[in-house]
Amino acid sequence: MLDDMASRAGTVALPQDLVDITALLDAYFDVTPDLGDPAQRVAFGTSGHRGSSLKSSFNEPHILAITQAIVEYRGRQGITGPLFIGRDTHALSEPAQNSALEVLAANGVTVLVDARHGYTPTPALSHAILKYNREAAPGTPQADGIVVTPSHNPPGDGGFKYNPPHGGPADTDATGWIAERANQLLENGLRGVKRIPLNDALNADTTGKFDFLSSYVDDLPSVLDLDAIRNAGVRIGADPMGGASVDYWGEIGERHQLNLTVVNPTVDPQWAFMTLDWDE
């Protein structure tokens, strides 16, 4: 299949090329990873764990274990402020975020989720962490965050990343500890993982809402001269390419009165509108 797809690079994907979203989501909940296979264990790269439920490398047990490990890590580091959490448009991101919320709420972690029930680009979540920590009164517990995204990975993949109080990707000391602890929890059959039902987690006193979009878009003039862009009459075309920024571009144009057109606001977890690449 990959050889065939490589020969068709640059052409529109055929129905048989697209990931089966139903099978992907079923596997997320139904498949238990084989920890004897290194490819099915938790392994962090670029601050996060990535994989596919269809390959037994990104399934609910992974997310439950990683989230519990993050809870324990932030406790060891004295990080007791709110944890911002956001997700992208990959099919596995929403169920993974929900799994994480069940663990975070069970552990009494104050969590802030998107007030619009939408998608959160990584820069918007990083900005929320930095803004909170910068504006907090001295002695206020610091915030951190989780971004549920595999970034540029294929539609069948999921990703789960931890951002400490500096807002950027966690370093290897942090991710190494989190991965090791997560694998220990998996090996112990998830004993030690605290969890409550999703509805209880969403309605917990410790679960709140945060407007990531407004916070990010309204702060753009602090780093960009949007007056100069507007006064120059620049015409901007923005293609979110099915990513988490899909709702941000229109708001940027409207709130800052820019001549900006969103040319493709489609969100499709199969990315059927994309042409094939040579490698997958």
Which sequence ranges carry the predicted segments?
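Gly/Ser/Thr-enriched, mixed-charge loops and adjacent short helices
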Residues: 2-40, 138-139, 156-280
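Conserved phosphate/anionic-ligand binding catalytic regions in large, soluble enzymes, centered on
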Residues: 39-58, 150-153, 240-248
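Glycine-rich phosphate/diphosphate-binding loops that line cofactor/substrate pockets in enzymes
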Residues: 67-83, 225-232
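N-terminal small/polar loop signature for handling phosphorylated ligands or for N-terminal nucleophile
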Residues: 15, 22, 76-80, 84-157, ...
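Short glycine-rich or small-residue beta-strand-to-loop segments that form or flank ligand, phosphate
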Residues: 52-53, 82-88, 235-238
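Phosphate-moiety recognition in structured ligand-binding domains
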Residues: 1-42, 56, 60, 65-68, ...
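Phosphate/oxyanion-binding active-site loops and adjacent basic polyanion-contact surfaces
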Residues: 58-71, 117-121, 209-217
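N-terminal glycine-rich anion-binding loops that anchor highly charged ligand groups
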Residues: 33-51, 69, 73, 77-78, ...
